[in-house]
Amino acid sequence: MLARRKPVLPALTINPTIAEGPSPTSEGASEANLVDLQKKLEELELDEQQKKRLEAFLTQKAKVGELKDDDFERISELGAGNGGVVTKVQHRPSGLIMARKLIHLEIKPAIRNQIIRELQVLHECNSPYIVGFYGAFYSDGEISICMEHMDGGSLDQVLKEAKRIPEEILGKVSIAVLRGLAYLREKHQIMHRDVKPSNILVNSRGEIKLCDFGVSGQLIDSMANSFVGTRSYMAPERLQGTHYSVQSDIWSMGLSLVELAVGRYPIPPPDAKELEAIFGRPVVDGEEGEPHSISPRPRPPGRPVSGHGMDSRPAMAIFELLDYIVNEPPPKLPNGVFTPDFQEFVNKCLIKNPAERADLKMLTNHTFIKRSEVEEVDFAGWLCKTLRLNQPGTPTRTAV
């Protein structure tokens, strides 16, 4: 008699590179998987709505079977970045709408196979704060990663429409990012490695999810050799090449929050004139209420347009930007515009020494997060109004 295998989530039993087919023991196996799924979901401390949505996603995913290039119909392009192009597609056999990321890599078959193997870990990442994964495969020189489609897009796209994102909305974003990072760390021992607005996705149901985290070391290495990715959200210790941990993700989250709150990438910091244009009134800074610095500063590299129109300042070179992150004071939220709780939360994320920087547990218990957890905020309504999306009948509960 064969040793009984440890049961796993249904997502793990669906190998995207193997065609779906009937199994003589599939009924018994599916019952065992259902029991195990329920146990796994209970461990995640989800509310009923989150549990139902996760179960619905996994049920849909179970119908997908093998993923093949010919089975996808392209609908539109969603964006480009991180060395790949993301398109909205329909998977014809299942009828599901997905987001398909295509990454072109000139690599040997052994490396390619290792990347596909490493990406299978994504089948185990089932959380309300992590974008769902359908599978990965290789075809014609490109690796395809097929994910849940989030109809609100990424927060950098939302920022273009919103100009600035309100503090109460960013409270819900902060909760989701912290819970997503904690899930990856505690359940899978994974660091994200690339937290930034374009890797935080939202949808019209009010869900906020992380994507593009560093699950495949081989893919990270291969892309580093093929693409010069942005380093502008990296923590100082990463830029200096020293050891980094989840604390580096905390820095990236803090920097992202300042960008989303102010309306542009915050290094170098906006001067008094720009802050007045952003907030519609003079903004004070410093302990004694002095007007914010009026010294002219260059704009961030490669960013001629902010949420507030064309930026006529000379561009900062990329090496100047990286030097600024390492050697200059960290960015902060201007005084008199945001609550002290939010300002302090961001400041704790942006401490340059990672040993002194707040960790996930400290931030989860911070007053800003505790307040945001109980605050009634219609995130779905705000997003749909901002992006002119149709709001579904059952948005996510406002208290995330």
From Swiss-Prot:
Intrachain S-S bonds: none
Span of domain Protein kinase: 72-369
Compartments it resides in: Cytoplasm; Membrane
One of the record's GO cellular component terms: early endosome
UniProt site (Cleavage): 10-11
Chemical reaction(s) catalysed: L-seryl-[protein] + ATP = O-phospho-L-seryl-[protein] + ADP + H(+); L-threonyl-[protein] + ATP = O-phospho-L-threonyl-[protein] + ADP + H(+); L-tyrosyl-[protein] + ATP = O-phospho-L-tyrosyl-[protein] + ADP + H(+)
Protein name: Dual specificity mitogen-activated protein kinase kinase 2
Species for this entry: Homo sapiens
Organism classification: Eukaryota, Metazoa, Chordata, Craniata, Vertebrata
Gene name, Swiss-Prot/TrEMBL: MAP2K2
